[in-house]
Regions:
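Non-catalytic accessory segments flanking P-loop/AAA+ NTPase cores
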Residues: 1-505
């Protein structure tokens, strides 16, 4: 899904149209999400006084598994352009228990925001970094030909050409340089300009001029792509970051562990990097990352990311029904209720310490989703229910929905399997009757066994195409027609037998 450059102009109707290209049905959920997303943009246009008073209306999506809750979140993340994080409520534990505390979701969202902002800044600096990377590649290809230090000697570069000498590997047809002749040509000119210059200085200047000429020849070859497969030695630095007490004090246990690991790496010298032999093509990628990382202002990245997270961040909490408690609390239920109470201040608005600074969660939009097949939304603690004022029920899927899911969305299941087999030279022709039959089987199995929604189609498609996928090399250049009879032959007896369908489909 393409990102919209001017997202503030994306109306709720346009957002729904974008989602329609990937998700079948569930119009109520799409409309609720579209309005919530649009309200984020509307709020940013308000005067500062009233802007702080407008709180996001958090959404609770209720629907059976496989009906599109997670897919809506996944597509929304690619569409909104704002810091977006999808988490599962079940991976968090109450404060005091072993596991991740709920505040880590804010730290993770902040990390997502920083990565997005850094990627944008690097893209803006990419053109400027090309010349820097080119010079560093030339320093590695021609050690000693780079910038001169105060003593007149070339600055030391890490790595360099292979031990046999890089010049010996160059094709004579590509470049021919007579260093002695160049030195002779340069020397008389230098003598005319500086008649009193010492002999050693003249020789050094002549050698420097020859080096520069050689460097420019190699620069031209580098730009023409003639050196991409040459091997060079270089020192690759791991981006382990600089540990500091701010990270330890303001982060989580994971941050503390990473900081301590960074300190240990610095003490044992592993932070200095590792020498590797790579091609020029690989070296360019490595150097580009290093140069861009050094050019980016990381303080500005953190500030801009924090602003985006606080003003337009979105967190999608999946499986929230799994932390709901039915009846009286006991055993593990106590911990589940504790997680709910820990989530409360985050959703309502509080300050969370992260390694990038303190983040205010007041205006972060939370979208929660759950099947609620065992528990009900009313089993959540009342305080948490009140933090999700908008409730949207998603519909169960039936055969007509399955038929549309198989064929209508962009990059649908049928399109995916057809494209995969085309790489083997096999053309797949799936008839409408076959699609109808697979849709009926999916509905029947969902009704007789566990209802897993559209995920049942993946299982059925794999079962129908199992033999073709295995024997694809034997059918190269052929067109295989999948009709209703073929589908029945592969699923014969399975859909009617509940025991078989429970374990196979």
């Amino acid at each position: 899904m393409e990102k919209i450059d001017n997202r503030t102009e994306l109306t709720p109707k346009q957002i729904v149209e974008k989602l329609d290209g990937y998700i079948i049905g569930q119009d109520k959920a799409k409309r609720a999400v579209a309005v919530a997303l649009r309200n984020r943009f509307r709020r940013l246009k308000l005067p500062e006084g009233i802007r702080d008073e407008v709180a996001p209306k958090n959404i609770l999506m209720i629907g059976p598994t496989g009906c599109g809750k997670t897919e809506i979140a996944r597509r929304l993340a690619k569409l909104c352009g704002a810091p977006f994080l999808k988490v599962e409520a079940t991976k968090y534990t109450e404060v005091g228990y072993v596991g991740r505390d709920v505040e880590s979701m804010i730290r993770d969202l902040m990390a997502v925001g920083c990565n997005d902002v850094k990627a944008e800044m690097e893209e803006q600096l990419r053109e400027k970094s090309v010349s820097v990377v080119e010079d560093r590649l030339l320093d590695l290809l021609l050690p000693g030909s780079g910038k001169k230090g105060k003593d007149g000697k070339s600055e030391k570069t890490e790595g360099g050409a292979k031990p046999l000498g890089f010049l010996s590997q160059v094709n004579p047809n590509e470049i021919t340089i007579d260093l002695h002749k160049m030195a002779e040509d340069i020397q008389p000119q230098d003598e005319a300009e500086n008649p009193g210059q010492p002999e050693n200085q003249k020789a050094d200047d002549s050698a420097a001029e020859a080096d520069n000429h050689t460097r420019e020849k190699f620069r031209q070859m580098l730009r023409e792509g003639k050196l991409e497969d040459r091997e060079i030695d270089m020192v690759v630095h791991r981006n382990i970051g600089m540990p500091n007490m701010e990270i330890i004090a303001g982060g989580s246990l994971d941050d503390l562990q990473n900081s301590m690991q960074g300190i240990l790496n610095m003490m044992n010298g592993s932070g200095r990097g590792k020498k590797r032999t790579v091609t020029v093509r690989e070296a360019r990628k490595i150097l580009t990352e290093e140069v861009l990382d050094s050019m980016v202002d990381h303080d500005k990245v953190a500030d801009e990311a924090r602003r985006r997270v606080e003003q337009s961040g979105i967190i999608f909490i999946d499986e929230i029904d799994k932390i709901a408690v039915r009846g009286e609390s006991h055993g593990q239920d106590v911990s589940r209720e504790g997680v709910q109470r820990d989530i409360l201040p985050i959703v309502e608005g509080s300050n969370v310490n992260t390694k990038f600074g303190v983040v205010d969660t007041t205006h972060i939009l939370f979208i929660a989703a759950g099947a609620f097949s065992v528990a009900a939304p009313s089993d959540l603690i009342p305080e948490l229910q009140g933090r999700f004022p908008l409730r949207v029920e998603l519909d169960s899927l039936h055969k007509d929905d399955f038929k549309r899911i198989l064929s209508e969305p962009k990059n649908s299941l049928i399109m995916q399997y057809t494209a995969l087999l085309e790489t083997e030279g096999v053309k797949l022709d799936i008839t409408d009757e076959a699609i109808d039959r697979m849709s009926v089987v999916a509905e029947e199995v969902n009704a007789s066994a566990e209802n897993i929604g559209a995920r049942r189609l993946h299982t059925i498609m794999e079962k129908v195409l199992a033999d073709i996928n295995f024997e694809a090399d034997e059918h190269k250049g052929e067109t295989i027609v999948i009709d209703a009879a073929y589908v029945d032959s592969k699923l014969e007896g399975i859909s009617q037998n509940q025991d078989l369908s429970r374990y196979i489909l």
